[in-house]
């Protein structure tokens, strides 16, 4: 049986037996290991190295009505991404976001995965060849049309998209590359 549980509640649900396993972003896999109630069967990096991950999404109406705010939002994400991608800043970021008002997870659990230090909970420890990346000289946050088109093809493949669409046109309308370029240019972020 599949159930939907918010990521921060997954460890607690495992602990009380409401679920036997889960697929989730960090730090919740590491938290289950740290708490001694789970292990990591595989990481998403094992399945698809450097895969697209989270999305900052806004409606077209928001972008049209508040273009400066939308641009500033992108700039804030780019600045934060550049900061976090610097390994020397990751410990302070882990400390900041570990607080109960943010992620509410132990700082050490967050920090180790930030640094690419993995422990699967059943005896294997390693330094990940593809640790979390947030900026990588502007490549990570760029809204690649190829990613958008790939996701659309998968929606079609798995029956979530019922009719044929112009994948490129849809990806262009969603990805807002021009707005991204404006924001990136103001910060001297390279455009891939």
Annotate each PLM feature:
Residues 65-179:
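Secondary-structure end/capping motifs
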Residues 1-16, 27:
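Short helix-initiation/N-cap motifs at beta->coil->alpha
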Residues 33-66, 74:
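Periplasmic-binding protein-like
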Residues 19-38:
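A ligand-binding cleft/hinge motif common to bilobed small-molecule-binding domains
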Residues 177-192:
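C-terminal functional modules
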Residues 1-2, 34, 156:
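Ligand-binding cleft/hinge of the Venus flytrap
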Residues 2-6, 20-24, 65-72:
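Short, contiguous, pocket-lining structural segments
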């Amino acid at each position: 049986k599949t159930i939907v549980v918010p990521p921060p509640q997954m460890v607690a649900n495992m602990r009380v037996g409401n679920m036997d396993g889960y697929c989730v972003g960090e730090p919740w896999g590491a938290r289950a290991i740290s708490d001694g109630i789970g292990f990591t069967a595989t990481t998403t990096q094992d399945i698809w190295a450097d895969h697209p991950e989270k999305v900052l999404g806004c409606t077209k109406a928001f972008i049209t009505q508040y273009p400066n705010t939308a641009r500033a939002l992108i700039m804030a994400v780019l600045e934060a991404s550049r900061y976090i991608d610097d390994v020397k800043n990751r410990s302070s970021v882990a400390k900041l976001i570990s607080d109960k008002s943010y992620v509410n997870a132990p700082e050490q659990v967050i920090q180790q995965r930030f640094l690419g230090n993995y422990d699967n909970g059943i005896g294997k420890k390693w330094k990940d060849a593809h640790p979390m990346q947030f900026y990588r000289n502007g490549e990570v946050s760029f809204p690649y049309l190829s990613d958008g088109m790939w996701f659309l093809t998968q929606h079609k493949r798995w029956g979530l998209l019922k009719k044929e669409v112009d994948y490129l046109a849809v990806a262009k309308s969603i990805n807002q590359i021009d707005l991204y370029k404006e924001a990136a240019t103001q910060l001297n972020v390279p455009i891939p």
